[in-house]
Amino acid sequence: MKRVLSAAVLLPLVLIVFILGNTYVVDVFMGIVALRCIYELFHAFEQKGHHPVRWVGYLAAIAIMFIHVIPEHYAKYAVISIIPISVLILFILVLTKKTKTDVIDIAITFFGVCYIVLFLMFMSIIINMENGKFLIWYVFIASWLTDVFAYLTGKAIGKHHFTDISPNKTIEGCIGGTLGATLCIILYTVLINKFAGFNINVAVISLIGIILSIVGQIGDLSASAIKRYAGIKDYSDLIPGHGGMVDRVDSVIFIAPFTYLLFILMF
């Protein structure tokens, strides 16, 4: 019941932000999501005695809120510069011995900036593309409906265990999730082709749907692998019935950059 109630609150919020909100609203929303995710990720690693540099991750997450405030020409350089600037700051901290940070902590902090901030930043990039208001829903369809169909298929016919990283996942569930999400992506494409004037090739979008669904499941398992390493069940109890923010967007984190890349390459 908690899971359903949480979804009933979160779904309208996402719909409002991504349908009614402009680019800047989406940027702020994704920046807040990234901030929470960075907090949860670093907290997970701290359970194993690591000391990631939180403020570097927080600053990188806040940067998402401003990527469309500055002129586009300069924004590209700002995005590219996040990684080298972050690494430089981290090594300065180690070399000057100002904190407990060591090389492993640098790697974890750098990983957090890439995994959370840069990957989620593609949500803001997609929404700012031509027809981005329509394209962004491929991310959500691939993420949400893979989860839904994987759960339903696994419950109905799941017999073969998939991986120890996530004991409840079955091979049948994974396949069912991909097939169900891909069919929904095809249906969405047919609808926007007919009613919004798009001309997206259904065969190509079918391939993209399969890839995005698989990538999303890898994202889910990757987040689970980190939890397993940290010895935690959920990243937090922020969202009743769902766990933390990372638990809720783990597949979106992986799907977003691949959605952008595949649409750039194939259309």
Map each language-model feature to its residues.
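Hydrophobic transmembrane alpha-helical segments of multi-pass transport and channel proteins
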Residues: S213-I218, M245-I253
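Juxtamembrane boundary at the C-terminal end of a transmembrane helix
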Residues: L261-F267
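A short, conserved beta-to-alpha structural element at the edge of catalytic cores
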Residues: G177, R248-V252, F267
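Membrane-embedded alpha-helical bundles of polytopic integral membrane proteins
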Residues: M1-I210
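Interfacial loop-to-transmembrane junctions
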Residues: R228-S251
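Short helical (or helix-break) motifs at transmembrane helix termini and adjacent helical loops
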Residues: L145-K155, G216-R228
